[in-house]
Design a protein with these regions (language model features):
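N-terminal membrane-anchoring/stem segments of glycan-assembly enzymes
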Residues: 1-50
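Acidic helix N-cap motif at the loop->helix transition within catalytic regions
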Residues: 68-69, 93-102, 148
């Protein structure tokens, strides 16, 4: 063991830089395999719809190019009882006019107009306040729902009374560029693997804000989304789990999304994600010392070490 004490700081530094990703990769693989064998393997058949209704919330800000497709796919949901609420978050383009037009076409569609842009968190809360049902399915204004996505998410929300939120499995549509194809591999394998392993080991770092289902009772207990946080999806995930609600990852609940295909766009997106994660860690570090929240410790420790490794 003497050699261990003879190492220089640079040796420890480079050892950590190279060995930490390798260690986490094996940890994720082991957790992902366990999740598949324990849960995913037995969930092949599309579940039967429950007797509960749901509200699909779609916050929209300057989505004139995509909102028609988004609403169209939402309306093709293979679930018997649902409503769609589109929230126009003070758009400056033709989003408002398009939504009003679509409301005349689809009887299930309701439109809420906000006078000015308030942000996604505020728009979601506005939609939740006017929704008629206990279960909320939230997607982005440019996301496309798979016809069975709501079935899978409602299956978990209604079957498990302690589940406060379920996160779906986003798939990337735009694959024309090399950057887009790389992100396809990232979302199809790495991100899904991490969520599977986190669910296996205890808690999930964050739901996918682009495709997520909530129990309104759970949201009401924690005060819904905070509009002062950079990434409201990470924040609401942590607060739900602080309130002892479970979060489920549902790989069969598919949604199709558009991702940045330029390095600048990708950099801005990932920078926002990183800032949001750090913001949540700083905001809730003191609460993490509570023994009742010990199941959140692995997620918090992993996040802290990952931030340290990144720097």
């Amino acid at each position: 063991m003497q050699w261990l004490f003879n190492l220089r700081f640079s040796d420890y530094y480079f050892g950590f830089a190279f060995l930490y990703p390798l260690f986490m990769a094996w940890l994720w693989i082991a957790g992902g395999i366990w999740f598949y064998l324990k849960r995913e393997y037995r969930e092949n058949d599309v579940p039967q719809p429950s007797e509960h209704a749901c509200s699909i919330l779609i916050p929209c800000f300057n989505e004139e190019d995509q909102v028609r497709e988004t609403i169209k796919y939402a309306m093709q949901t293979q679930y018997p009882d649902f409503e769609v609420i589109a929230i126009n978050d003070g758009s400056s383009d033709k989003t408002a006019e398009i939504l009003d037009e679509l409301q005349q076409t689809y009887s299930r569609l309701r439109v809420v107009h906000l006078a000015e842009n308030q942000g996604k968190a505020y728009a979601l809360k506005a939609g939740a306040m006017v929704s008629q049902h206990e279960y909320l399915i939230c997607i982005d204004g440019d996301a496309l729902l798979h016809p069975h996505a709501v079935l899978w998410m409602m299956h978990h929300l209604t079957r498990f009374p302690r589940v406060g939120a379920v996160t779906g499995n986003p798939r990337i549509i735009n694959r024309s560029s090399i950057l887009g194809k790389i992100q396809v591999g990232e979302f199809s394998s790495i991100i899904g693997l991490i969520k599977r392993s986190q669910r296996t080991y205890g808690r999930i770092f964050t739901v996918s804000g682009v495709l997520v289902g909530f129990r309104k009772t759970a949201l009401d207990r924690i005060g819904y989304w905070r509009d002062d946080m950079i990434t409201e999806d990470i924040d609401v995930s942590w607060r739900l789990q602080f309130d002892h609600w479970d979060l489920h990852y549902v790989p069969n609940a598919l949604g199709y999304i558009y991702m940045p295909e330029t390095f600048i766009g990708l950099w801005k997106q990932r920078l926002r994600w990183a800032q949001g994660g750090i913001e949540v860690l700083l905001a809730y570090t003191k609460q993490m010392f509570n023994w009742r929240l010990r199941r959140m410790w692995p997620v918090a420790i992993e996040s802290m070490i990952s931030i340290l490794w990144a720097y």
